[in-house]
Amino acid sequence: MASTASFMLAVLLAVAVAAAPARAVRCPPSDKQALMRVKQSLGNPATLSTWSLASADCCEWDHVRCDEAGRVNNVFIDGANDVRGQIPSAVAGLTALMSLSLFRLPGLSGPIPACLTALSNLQFLTISHTNVSGVIPDSLARIRSLDSVDLSHNSLTGPIPNSFSDLPNLRSLDLRSNKLTGCIPAGLVQGQFRSLILSYNQLTGPIPRDDAQDEINTVDLSHNRLTGDASFLFAAGRPIGKVDLSWNDLDFDLSKLVFPPELTYLDLSHNRIRGTVPRSLAALSTLQTLDLSYNRLCGPLPRLHGVIRHGCKPYEHNQCAGGAPLGGCHQS
């Protein structure tokens, strides 16, 4: 009887094991080999010392994260002075990668490789504070899953690819502090964007107009050579919180603008903006930073606490043309 029970128990255990799904292998050989090639291409830096064939599970390595299936889905290398060379083409072998961050790597140089398009699951791409140079490859727009792209503080040149406007999931684009030239592509200041930062470049021409109701919250186009009208950015219904258009050559009438109630930061200084300071600006209780200096604004200032509470500096050096000088600012 006992032997029969033992036999039945053994059978049940065997069936249970056979029916159980096979456990995913953490860090498959293809991922490990790709990481080792990346390390070699970057000069075998001490920063990546844990990347070793002696360690079976690359999911435990520094600067690496894996998903539930055991695939490498996040590589982040930052603040390393011993990383040298170009962005390795071997990165393309990490086919499950969702996030790639190469940040504060002064020894990283060369172009952005077109092979990144093989990363069809990539959502977050950061290549920032490096010496990466050359043009932004148009092929990046083939990565349809991209949600956030940060290519700031590099030495990138040439235009912003028009194809960036067609990325269906892109919510944040940061290209500040490069050497980019040309116009802002039509459709980039619109739609699904929540944050668009293109400051400290050499961009020219008008800001492409779009009157769609969108979710954009942050626009920083400062320190470029942009011209024309930017008043449409403040259209009714836009939940915009931060706008920095300073140090351009923008020319539009400020008088009748109605600013969104969510606005917390507004810098329009060093342009050719004209008109008067609208009363709607004085009503913004959330506004923390304001600068309208070095324009062509005329007076008087609205006699409301919401304007004067920022002090007089935000209104300095306005050369009014054809009207009363901008005055009436007296701090108590």
Swiss-Prot record:
InterPro entries: Leu-rich_rpt, LRR_dom_sf, LRR_N_plant-typ, PGIP. Gene3D superfamilies: Ribonuclease Inhibitor. The keyword Repeat applies. GO terms for biological process: cell differentiation; specification of floral organ number. This is Polygalacturonase inhibitor 1. Highly expressed in calli, immature and mature panicles, and in three inner floral organs: lodicules, stamens and carpels. Expressed at low level in seedling roots and mature stems. Belongs to the polygalacturonase-inhibiting protein family. Keywords: Cell wall, Differentiation, Disulfide bond, Glycoprotein, Leucine-rich repeat, Repeat, Secreted, Signal. LRR repeats lie at residues 72-96, 97-118, 119-142, 143-166, 167-192, 193-215, 216-236, 237-259, 260-283, 284-310. It is found in: Secreted, Cell wall. GO terms for molecular function: enzyme inhibitor activity. Glycans are attached at N131. Coiled coil: none annotated. The keyword Transport does not apply. GO terms for cellular component: extracellular region. Inhibitor of fungal polygalacturonase. Regulates floral organ number. Disruption phenotype: Increased numbers of floral organs, including the stamen, carpel, palea/lemma, stigma and lodicule. Its main location: secreted. Disulfide bonds join C27-C58, C59-C66, C298-C312, C298-C320, C320-C329. Residues 1-24 form the signal peptide.
